[in-house]
Structures are given as structure tokens and as C-alpha cells.
Regions:
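Short, surface-exposed "cap/lid" segments of acyl-processing enzymes
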Residues: 44-76, 80-85
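Short beta-strand/loop motif that positions the catalytic acidic residue
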Residues: 230, 236-238
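Catalytic histidine-centered segment of alpha/beta-hydrolase-like enzymes
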Residues: 269-278
């Protein structure tokens, strides 16, 4: 009984510390766009590396999994910066909408991540770059194009996988139009605005070059392929209850010989690692950092 009371007291203390450390909005400029992020201090500033966190598809830095990661890292004494990719919109907040012309480009994330890395370098010489879902793939695209020595490690949480045949079949099933037909239209004039289903939007006005970035073979959106040649330490998390994880599991052979890559499965977790699974993520990350 006494042990349980002590444990409860420690948990309550941690929650109190967490509640007194509010995330601070940060804004910088990049190529004429205002970029937003949430800066989370910790109870013990300077304890370890700074975590720079990238959200998933058309999401934002305040979504549940990202905010949970920041809170858990803060309780453990680590500072973090959760960014909002602009998706082509200056001062973007919240989830992406289908109501306006979509100019988001999958590949543009790499340069925006680099802009935030440059900012983060003014705060810390040791950076861990974290990406969830599509953000995990975009973190890998970043590391292919930019080589900041301060970015020492990468963490990918349920990173995106991609198969061209499956993508085409899924697109036609969801939208009712062959993907090849829309791609031909988009390639005909990449600067045109076309009407098409794209990502989560069943029908939207979208810049043709943006559409291409989400459905063409380049940039490479199949993260297991990118892991084959990564030259810095990478930790990949997958949840056993994530229906999307099968695409990753089936391609482990592509990178299993690369000793830089560590894969950790979390039993019971789905794609978003909610509640206590978020703490398991952070525990796994911190244990990995000590190796």
C-alpha cells in the first residue's frame, strides 16, 4: 500500500510539473510564408537533445499524438519543438481543409524541416528529428537532402509506406476515376488548377504539380526503401494494432542489413499511439538514446 501511495505521489508531481509548463507558439518565415510551431520547455532545461517533431498527413503540431509526445518529453526533462508544415498556406493552423485550392506539395516539407532545423540549432547543438506517419517519410526526405551535423538521430513513428499499384487501385476505388487519367491531365500542365480527388479530399481544386507530388513515383514516399541507405541512427516504431503497419512489415528485407536502423513494435498500439502508448514511445526513445 505504501509503495502504491509513493507511486501515485510521483505521478501527481509529474502531472503538476507538466501542467505548469505551457507550450509557447513560435513563428518564423520561409520563402514568403509564415511557419508556426509549438515550443515546449521542460522542468530540467538543457538536460539532453532537443526533439523536433513533424506531424502526419495534412495535420498540425497540436494534434493529440504530437502534444502527448511534447508533454511526456517535458516531464522527462527534454525540450521539444512541434512544427506545422505550411502545406502552401501562410500562418497555417489546424487540419488542412478541402475548401480552398490545394497547393501543398509532399516534397516541400524537406526544405521547411531544414528551415526549422536551422532555427533549432540556435537552441541546441544536439537535435533528434521525429516524424509521425507521412511526417516520418518527410523526415527521411530531409535527411537525404540536408546534412546538419546537429541532427544526430531520427525517430519514425508509423512511417508512411507506398506501393504504386495499390495507390492506383485505392484511388480509383475512392474517387471513381482512374489515377492514370488524372496524372496525365496533371502532367499536361503542372501549373494548372485541376479538379480531382486528392489525399483526404474526394473532390477539390488542386494545383496540378501538387497532385503529382502525392501520386507520382517521386518523391519516394516508400519509407522502407529510404531506410536501406540511411547513414545515421534511426529508430522506427510500429503498433501491432495499426492496419497500415503490414505495408512496413512486408518490406523489412529492404533495410534489415542496415545496422543504423532499429525497429520496435509496441503491443496493442494503433497508428496514433494514444494515451499510455505515447509514454511507451517516449520510454523507448529515451532508452534508445542511452545505447
Amino acid at each position: 500500500m505504501r509503495r502504491k501511495l509513493i507511486h501515485l505521489a510521483l505521478v501527481m508531481l509529474a502531472l503538476f510539473q507538466m501542467s505548469t509548463i505551457a507550450a509557447t507558439p513560435v513563428q518564423i518565415e520561409h520563402q514568403g510564408l509564415l511557419l508556426n510551431a509549438n515550443w515546449q520547455e521542460s522542468a530540467e532545461p538543457g538536460r539532453g537533445p532537443l526533439f523536433l517533431i513533424v506531424h502526419g498527413t495534412w495535420a498540425h503540431g497540436g494534434m493529440e499524438i504530437i502534444a502527448g509526445l511534447q508533454d511526456s518529453l517535458a516531464v522527462n526533462g527534454y525540450e521539444s519543438l512541434a512544427i506545422n508544415l505550411s502545406l502552401g498556406i501562410s500562418d497555417r493552423q489546424g487540419f488542412m481543409s478541402c475548401d480552398k485550392v490545394i497547393k501543398a506539395n509532399h516534397a516541400d516539407a524537406a526544405a521547411e524541416i531544414n528551415r526549422w532545423v536551422e532555427f533549432a540549432k540556435t537552441l541546441s547543438d544536439h537535435i533528434v528529428l521525429v516524424g509521425h506517419s507521412r511526417g516520418g517519410n518527410q523526415v527521411m526526405l530531409y535527411q537525404q537532402q540536408f546534412q546538419a551535423s546537429e541532427v544526430e538521430r531520427l525517430v519514425l513513428i508509423a512511417p508512411m509506406t507506398w506501393n504504386p499499384a495499390e495507390s492506383a487501385a485505392d484511388y480509383e476505388a475512392q474517387v471513381g476515376r482512374p489515377l492514370a487519367e488524372v496524372m496525365a491531365q496533371a502532367h499536361g500542365d503542372p501549373n494548372a488548377i485541376i479538379t480531382a480527388g486528392v489525399v483526404y479530399c474526394p473532390a477539390a481544386e488542386v494545383l496540378a504539380s501538387s497532385f503529382i507530388s502525392y501520386y507520382d513515383t517521386e518523391p519516394n514516399r516508400n519509407t522502407p526503401e529510404l531506410l536501406a541507405t540511411v547513414a545515421r541512427p534511426v529508430l522506427v516504431f510500429e503498433g501491432t494494432e495499426d492496419p497500415l503497419a503490414s505495408g512496413f512489415k512486408s518490406q523489412v528485407a529492404l533495410f534489415e542489413k542496415n545496422q543504423q536502423v532499429t525497429v520496435q513494435w509496441i503491443d496493442g498500439a494503433d497508428h496514433f499511439f494514444r494515451d499510455l502508448y505515447t509514454d511507451e514511445l517516449v520510454d523507448g526513445i529515451l532508452e534508445w538514446l542511452q545505447r
